[in-house]
């Protein structure tokens, strides 16, 4: 159970929650990318996807640059990672049932330590193709919609119409699954859900003084995307992933100094246990702290309402305080 929970938490740290707060990737402590093979292999795969269900390339796509095709594939894979579309055994029923939240909420594996994703909390968003999908009840992304992120990304990279982009996005995911880069799961409603095998998400520690360009910044909206050394060149000068932004991504260096990066890399992390968290104290010490807080005339070292906020944890009704 501990191993399952650790693997799930790691997937959240480098996936769905990678941009929330001071995460390891956001602070430049680690580089994360999806290992999908050589750039030439991905480019060939993308070019085959342009042929749809037939051999060869559809008319009008012969002149698409390799850099655009590579950005198309790489952007798709990294978006899946950041959306939390990383496979885990706890998400199997969730995927088969079209992303219904009950499998990661009140029907989750509580006994194994699976965390809850109630309404209001962002949930893993796997791309889904085929069949109908009620987006009011599912966090999954309907790839076939011309308004989906995947269709929009395809339109930006290949400069095609939204409807055509949605079809190409579906074909690309299918080709990636055929190549073993993605997994494909049939759903109860007849759709197909695509996911990243956890083993393809690679995490690499970054040194404090590396001079590599490991940050992608949009030249228009200034959106920042941490990048790994293995993939930053594949997205340099690619379209901005923000749906409504016309800008391009530019590779640059991360800030030279980071408080959180230095803290995470430190060997001696100290935990501060505040006295007002009295469940951590012995009975005698707890009584002394509580009495010192409540007495009308306090000594200089007594905790007071300005520094001790969790008063209910000390068994004190704050309404009784003057």
Model-derived regions: residue spans:
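Conserved two-lobed SF2 helicase motor
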Residues: 299-318
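Helicase motor interdomain insertion/brace
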Residues: 1-295
């Amino acid at each position: 159970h501990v191993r399952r929970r650790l693997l799930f938490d790691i997937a959240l740290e480098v996936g769905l929650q990678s941009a929330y707060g001071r995460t390891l990737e956001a602070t430049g402590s680690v580089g994360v990318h999806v290992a999908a093979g050589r750039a030439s292999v991905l480019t060939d795969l993308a070019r085959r996807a342009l042929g749809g269900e037939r051999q060869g390339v559809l008319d009008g796509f012969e002149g698409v640059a390799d850099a655009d095709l590579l950005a198309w594939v790489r952007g798709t894979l990294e978006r899946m990672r950041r959306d939390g579309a990383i496979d885990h055994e706890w998400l199997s029923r969730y995927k088969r049932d079209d992303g219904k939240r009950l499998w990661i909420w009140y029907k989750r594996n509580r006994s194994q330590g699976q965390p809850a994703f109630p309404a209001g909390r962002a949930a893993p968003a796997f791309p889904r193709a085929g069949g109908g999908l009620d987006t009011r009840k599912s966090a999954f992304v309907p790839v076939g919609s011309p308004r989906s992120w995947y269709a929009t990304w395809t339109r930006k990279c290949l400069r095609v119409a939204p409807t055509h982009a949605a079809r190409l996005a579906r074909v690309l995911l299918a080709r990636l699954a055929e190549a073993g880069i993605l997994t494909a799961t049939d759903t109860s409603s007849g759709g197909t859900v695509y996911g990243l095998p956890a083993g393809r998400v690679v995490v690499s520690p970054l040194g404090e003084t590396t001079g590599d360009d490991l940050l992608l910044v949009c030249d228009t909206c200034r959106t920042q995307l941490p990048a790994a050394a293995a993939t930053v060149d594949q997205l340099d000068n690619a379209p901005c992933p923000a749906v409504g932004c016309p800008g391009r991504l530019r590779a640059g260096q991360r800030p030279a100094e980071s408080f959180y990066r230095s803290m995470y890399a430190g060997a001696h992390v100290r935990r501060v246990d505040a006295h007002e968290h009295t469940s951590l104290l012995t009975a005698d010490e707890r009584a002394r702290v509580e009495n010192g807080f409540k007495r009308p005339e306090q000594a200089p070292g007594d905790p007071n309402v300005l520094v001790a906020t969790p008063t209910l944890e000390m068994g004190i009704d704050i309404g009784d305080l003057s």
